[in-house]
């Protein structure tokens, strides 16, 4: 048989709605490659729940390397430790060009904790990272062959004329991420509670969207019950329908302190919606959110600072509108055609 142009080893979810950042990034890149080269030229192995059928997974993985001209792997931090050594072993027999589509910003810390991984990473012909500071941090640690591949989405971007001055007294805020404590969801709740108290009434509501891990279901149920007057959880949104969901909101809250944060995909959703982002100054968030320009940055684990940032936008509607317009201007930078140009060139070498 003719060899596939590229084989991709990644997490594509369990067949339901795709919600976590790793699966969304891998799925979007794969779809764009299939659109450009045809599905018959792109081979895929899904690493989701591979432990349920390990023999079948290993065989498919081996065949992917054997039958592809170039092989890309898209692991997050846990998968890296399992899948990269396995890929290197299989590739010993075939010597394919290897690509690491890096998910998040975990690699610098992983190298610091496990310096032996540096040699393994330098066996890749190309590593595609999400932000310039991730690239710099990896280069400082001796990693080579680094390219840029930011997050990307093909969305129905709002028009500039849609961004009008919001004069409503009552506003809606949202959290649009995995619903877990290290994403700052409890800080967001506390901040909205504080903001309403300072405003002297129930003027701000908060909606959660995103994947809810089973280990957090009980805790979220408690939070929803305790804050029923202003808090709701709406489940998972299709990754290509985010603009339609986010349009009614005043701002997005992202008070994360998750250890593997890189380029959060929800920023691209906010850019295409023209939605101001209030985010923590954590890891690589400042690569995408410029304080006072297209969002506001706050310290981590600080509901009071988050409350102050919410009220800053609430009380200065012209600032809110300008930040929204600035965000909308950034959307074009994260369209698939612009983002994947270098990646396509590497594949076609």
Language-model segments: what does each one mean?
Residues 24-28, 180-196, 261, 304:
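A conserved mid-protein helix/loop that constitutes part of the nucleotide-sugar donor-binding site
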Residues 46, 204-218, 235:
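Glycosyltransferase donor-sugar binding loop
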Residues 123-160:
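Donor nucleotide-sugar binding/catalytic pocket of nucleotide-sugar-dependent glycosyltransferases
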Residues 159, 312, 333-349:
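C-terminal alpha-helical cap of glycosyltransferases
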Residues 291-292, 296-303, 312-318, 332:
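Conserved acidic donor-binding segment of nucleotide-sugar-dependent glycosyltransferases
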């Amino acid at each position: 048989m003719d060899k596939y142009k590229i084989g991709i080893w990644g997490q594509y979810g369990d067949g339901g709605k795709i919600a976590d950042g790793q699966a969304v990034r891998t799925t979007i890149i794969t779809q764009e490659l299939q659109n450009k080269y045809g599905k018959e030229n792109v081979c895929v192995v899904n690493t989701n729940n591979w432990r349920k059928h390990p023999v079948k997974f290993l065989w498919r993985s081996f065949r992917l390397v054997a039958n592809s001209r170039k092989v890309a792997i898209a692991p997050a931090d846990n998968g890296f430790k399992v899948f990269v050594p396995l890929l290197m072993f299989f590739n010993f027999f075939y010597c394919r060009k290897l690509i690491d589509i890096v998910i998040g910003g975990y690699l610098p810390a992983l190298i610091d904790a496990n310096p032996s991984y540096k040699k393994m990473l330098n066996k890749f012909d190309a590593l595609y990272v999400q932000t310039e500071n991730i690239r710099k941090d990896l280069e400082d640690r001796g990693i080579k062959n680094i390219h840029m591949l930011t997050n990307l989405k093909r969305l129905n971007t709002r028009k500039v004329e849609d961004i009008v001055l919001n004069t409503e007294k009552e506003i809606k805020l949202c959290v649009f991420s995995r619903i877990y404590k290290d994403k700052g969801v409890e800080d967001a709740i506390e901040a909205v509670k504080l903001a309403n108290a300072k405003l002297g009434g129930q003027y701000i509501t908060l909606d959660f969207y995103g994947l809810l891990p089973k280990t957090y279901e009980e805790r979220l149920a408690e939070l929803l019950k305790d804050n029923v007057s202003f808090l709701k959880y709406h489940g998972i949104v299709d990754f290509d329908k985010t603009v339609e969901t986010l349009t009614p909101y005043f701002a997005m809250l992202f008070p994360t302190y998750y250890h593997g944060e890189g380029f959060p995909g929800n920023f691209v959703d906010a850019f295409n919606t023209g939605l101001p982002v209030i985010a923590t100054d954590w890891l690589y968030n400042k690569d995408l959110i410029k304080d006072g320009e297209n969002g506001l940055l706050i310290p981590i684990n600080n509901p009071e600072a988050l409350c102050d940032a919410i009220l800053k936008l609430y009380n200065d509607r012209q600032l809110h509108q300008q930040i929204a317009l600035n965000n909308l201007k950034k959307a074009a930078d994260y369209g698939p055609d612009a983002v994947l140009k270098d990646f396509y060139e590497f594949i076609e070498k």
